[in-house]
Regions:
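Long, charged, mostly alpha-helical binding arms that flank functional sites
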Residues: 1-112
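Basic, alpha-helical terminal appendages of large translation-related enzymes
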Residues: 66, 70, 75, 85-168
Length: 168
């Protein structure tokens, strides 16, 4: 039980730090509004080559669903929290690699900056849906901070996990 509390605390701190970091950059660079990016921004081979970590993060979040299903079925909540914590770390790595604070200084990199910030916010939205069953107040706070409305009681929750559903 002590391990579960520790993992839960680490996850809440990780999500909170990621949320704060993301929202601060959006506030500074996008007038506080989540940027809008084309839904097909990863469809070209060139885009996938330019953003390999984005592709990794997106795939990592997609596979999280299967990991969580196994954890819920076996009541292995520590594993569930560890899987989610790993994805939070992936998003942090993505941000660090793309250095949006540097992109913001170059007007020619505006599109790239918006893709990075949108991706971070979209990852947070999806992570919020995944943590809701074990950390409902964290998930609700995350949605509120992102300025989005989520119906956590919907039986169609998985349909909302589709990448690119974050309104910009």
């Amino acid at each position: 039980q002590a391990l579960a509390r520790r993992v839960n605390s680490d996850l809440a701190n990780g999500i909170g730090n990621l949320l704060s970091r993301t929202l601060t950059m959006i506030e500074r660079n996008c007038s506080g509004s989540i940027p809008t990016v084309p839904t097909d921004y990863l469809d070209s081979e060139a885009a996938r080559a330019k953003y390999p970590l984005l592709v990794h993060v997106k795939e990592s979040l997609r596979t999280l669903e299967d990991c969580l299903d196994e954890s819920y079925e076996s009541l292995a909540f520590n594993n569930l929290l560890l899987h989610i914590t790993s994805r939070v770390s992936d998003v942090d790595t993505f941000i660090d690699k793309h250095e949006p604070w540097k992109l913001a200084k170059d007007p020619d990199k505006r599109d790239e900056l918006e893709i990075v910030l949108y991706t971070a916010a979209e990852c947070l939205r999806i992570l919020g849906l995944y943590v809701y069953p074990v950390m409902p107040s964290t998930a609700k706070n995350l949605a509120e901070q992102l300025g989005i409305s989520l119906d956590f009681n919907s039986p169609l929750l998985r349909q909302k996990i589709t990448w690119g559903s974050l309104p910009g």
